[in-house]
Amino acid sequence: MKKFLIIGGGAMGSAFTIPCLENKNDVVITEPYSKKFIKELSSKRKYHSALKMNLPKKLKFRKYSGDLLKEKFDLIVIALSLPGIDFIGKELKKNNINTPLLVLTKGLKYISRSKKIFTISEKLQKVSGIKNISVLKGPCLAKELARKHQTSVIIANKNINFAKKIGKRISTKYYLNEF
């Protein structure tokens, strides 16, 4: 993997770009909702108010659109808040995207009609139809990651070799991962 699209310009999505860029990946970040983050990420300084720091100059910001989703990426990283999961799932399906996903979003989704609880990856798979979905979980705070404090995460996928492939592209001395 080399070209990543990160959807979600909040604290975790933006912090996650740092180890990705350090591993020489081509990283594009986009933000579908927050005008504040859109303004910050598209500026020359790339100052992120939630992280209270400038993001790397190599980070590319692109305006969110269906056309952006259709571009060739090796991995799409979902870093939206829980309410954005349905939106992005529908967008991925509408644009016929089948790129592997890595989900950073934490939490569970309760569907009141069926009275069922879904993990975020289950919900995304159901809405988007994408089968290759990995999740990244762990005791990792965005500010710690952005400041390169040692932290660790677990990457899970039904195909452990694919999870390991992601791990190789994001692991650093301070950002450790297991599978």
Region spans (language model):
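Conserved anion/nucleotide-ligand pocket segment
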Residues: 148-178
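Hydrophobic beta-strand segments of well-ordered beta-sheets in folded domains
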Residues: 4, 27, 100-102, 151-153
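Conserved residues at beta->alpha junctions
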Residues: 31-32, 79-80, 157
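Rossmann-like NAD(P)(H) cofactor-binding subdomain of soluble oxidoreductases
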Residues: 55, 62-66, 71-149, 163-167
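A structural micro-motif
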Residues: 2, 25, 59, 99, ...
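NAD(P)+-binding Rossmann beta1-loop-alpha1 motif at the extreme N-terminus of oxidoreductases
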Residues: 1-54, 59-63, 70, 111, ...
